[in-house]
Design a protein with these regions (language model features):
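PP2C/PPM-type serine/threonine phosphatase catalytic domain
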Residues: 1-237
Length: 237
């Protein structure tokens, strides 16, 4: 199994970039993550960088790590860092851990993981937000999340309390061929049909991401958010 991937992070029109990301290979496994520091709290960029740095260290020490447990430990570490620095810094995080047997997808907050098969979405992580709650209650459609007034109000984030747990989904490696991991600043500007169309028309991860980045750039003026994405293609052999 081979991994082909590309990534980027853009400040948008904000004063600073509070997004962080990770892509790392080791012993035939790959881990990738995107974290989006909460802008309403001091130290969002510190929180997101802390989360991905800690995750990378754990992966480098053990490529077969328990992703859910690792995120629980990172959450505890972030709470400790809050006390040390005197800042209530918080962050979203979504991550995938791919090995020969399967793929583990984990998310906390409203950064997203998409899995694609034959240019169609076969899996999408669920946001932890007030807008997603409205979807669950049947008050708005999933597409309505992008324009909902409470889209940025999260119901779960790293650093918000001690007993935070990620949503964990295990994917069979044969069930998908491509992955997209991104912050809300990215998926807010690129709708799902555009993701699929860009993938269908691309030969490489770089082409796929480049097309979507242009689409995101065309829409980003609406909220000026940081936007970050990692794309991965899985190849046999």
């Amino acid at each position: 199994m081979r991994f082909l991937y590309d990534s980027y992070s853009d400040i948008g029109k904000r004063d600073k970039n509070e997004d962080s990301f990770l892509v790392c290979e080791r012993e035939g496994a790959l881990i990738a993550a995107v974290a989006d520091g909460l802008g309403g709290c001091r130290g969002g960029e510190v929180a997101s960088a802390f989360a991905v740095d800690e995750l990378k260290q754990r992966f480098e020490a053990n490529a077969a790590l328990d992703l859910g447990k690792a995120l629980e430990e990172i959450n505890s570490g972030l709470l400790l860092k809050q006390r040390e620095l005197g800042m209530k810094m918080k962050t979203t995080i979504c991550a995938v851990l791919i090995n020969a047997e399967h793929t583990v997808a984990a998310n906390i907050g409203d950064s997203r993981i998409y899995a694609f098969k034959d240019d169609r979405i076969v899996f999408q992580s669920t946001d932890h937000s007030v807008a997603q709650m409205c979807v669950d209650l049947g008050e708005i459609t999933p597409e309505g999340i992008r324009t909902h007034e409470d889209r940025c109000i999260l119901t779960r984030s790293l650093g918000s309390k001690q007993d935070i747990r990620a949503d964990i989904t295990v994917l069979d490696n044969s069930s998908y061929d491509s992955l997209l991991i991104c912050s809300d600043g990215f998926w807010g500007g690129v709708v799902e049909q555009q993701m699929c169309s860009a993938l269908e028309q691309s030969e490489t991860p770089g082409e796929w991401l480049g097309t979507m980045r242009k689409l995101c750039g065309a829409e980003i003026n609406s909220d000026n958010d940081n936007n970050t994405a990692v794309v991965i293609n899985i190849k046999e052999g």
